[in-house]
């Protein structure tokens, strides 16, 4: 890696502003398209992964992230695929942590399936990672193996324990799936809140190849919330984490529950984020196909000025909203790329 010594404390940079007046302060970076699970709503079972030569190096990822931070990004989330299966990923995380120490970055975090957490939790905490999201749709070992196609639930639970013992706050992300985990959502909430973990429920999104009718899988969170309201006392709160979730508190558990509703309640009006893939493609919107090739700009010049200009041009094309829709007639997604490539 290039010289990444800690810099003195810096003043916050003015954020990038998109055509609709929204400040872009949040960068999600997919560091790999590979994963040790094959979740049915995320990727195909026999996935064809990108050749390693097409991936940005760790040094290039560091440089790109650093330019975004110089341009006003305050929150950086590493995703995948599964970010912790990327070789030498802790070198990248350790180097990016200098931006926390300098004050240029408010938060460095990641979304993980939890399979590698037992191994890396201590190092993550040492690098200044204070919060992580763990994707977990069920506490039933057989169902877990079905949805992930071969995942080991006990390994994930061990990873969550390790993260909490290391002082990392864990939030559980669960995709609500009709006739799969809808009946056990209350149990998942009680379990998580009993361990001081927030829960965020997510509507399934029409992305990537699908092996069965996506409409059969889709469960509107408005329905889930109504069902939960018959068991719990829900109260809306203004709590935000920088993402699109809207939160409530549950009186009976004392915990927080978030709802991410791309289908039933468009969250685009407050969108503050862009997504960078492991190949250097920048997506200004999760639900649009428009992209910008930052790898080309990165490799054309050692100067960051050309790269900065390419980022500015991309931000100028950030759309007002996504085009997510489930095509009920042809059983196909509105966005063809897999979530594992875009960054979950």
UniProtKB/Swiss-Prot annotation:
PROSITE patterns: MOAA_NIFB_PQQE, RADICAL_SAM
Annotated S-adenosyl-L-methionine binding sites: 41, 81, 135, 205
One GO term of the biological process aspect: Mo-molybdopterin cofactor biosynthetic process
Record pathway: Cofactor biosynthesis; molybdopterin biosynthesis
Top-level taxon of the source organism: Bacteria
Function statement: Catalyzes the cyclization of GTP to (8S)-3',8-cyclo-7,8-dihydroguanosine 5'-triphosphate.
Subunit structure as annotated in this protein's UniProt entry: Monomer and homodimer.
Protein name as it appears in the record: GTP 3',8-cyclase
The organism of origin for this protein: Brucella ovis (strain ATCC 25840 / 63/290 / NCTC 10512)
């Amino acid at each position: 890696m290039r010289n990444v010594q800690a810099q003195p404390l810096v003043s916050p940079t003015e954020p990038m502003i998109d055509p609709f007046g929204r400040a872009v302060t949040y960068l999600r970076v997919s560091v790999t398209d590979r994963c040790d699970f094959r979740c049915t709503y995320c990727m195909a079972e026999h996935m064809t992964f990108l050749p390693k030569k097409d991936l940005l190096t760790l040094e290039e990822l560091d440089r790109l992230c650093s330019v975004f931070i110089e341009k006003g990004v305050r929150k950086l989330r590493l995703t995948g695929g599964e970010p912790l299966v990327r070789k030498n990923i802790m070198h990248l995380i350790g180097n990016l942590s200098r931006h926390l120490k300098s004050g240029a970055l408010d938060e460095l975090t990641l979304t993980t399936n939890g399979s590698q957490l037992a191994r890396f939790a201590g190092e993550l905490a040492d690098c200044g990672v204070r919060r992580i999201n763990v994707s977990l749709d069920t506490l039933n070992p057989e169902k877990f193996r079905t949805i992930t196609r071969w995942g080991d639930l006990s390994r994930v639970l061990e990873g969550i324990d390790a993260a909490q013992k290391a002082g990392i706050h864990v939030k559980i992300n669960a995709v609500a799936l009709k006739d799969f985990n809808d009946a056990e959502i209350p149990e998942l909430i009680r379990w998580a809140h009993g361990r001081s973990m927030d829960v965020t429920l997510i509507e399934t999104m029409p992305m990537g190849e699908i092996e069965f009718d996506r409409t059969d899988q889709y469960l509107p969170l408005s329905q889930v919330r109504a069902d939960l309201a018959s068991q719990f006392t829900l109260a809306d709160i203004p709590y935000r984490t920088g993402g699109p979730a809207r939160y409530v508190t549950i009186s009976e558990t004392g915990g927080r529950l978030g709802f991410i509703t791309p289908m039933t309640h468009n969250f685009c009006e407050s969108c503050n984020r862009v997504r960078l893939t492991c190949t250097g493609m920048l997506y200004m919107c999760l639900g649009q196909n428009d992209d910008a090739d930052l790898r080309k700009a990165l490799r054309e010049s050692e100067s960051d000025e050309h790269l900065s200009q390419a980022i500015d041009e991309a931000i100028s094309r950030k759309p007002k909203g996504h085009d997510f829709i489930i095509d009920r007639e042809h059983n196909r997604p509105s966005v063809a790329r897999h979530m594992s490539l875009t960054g979950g």
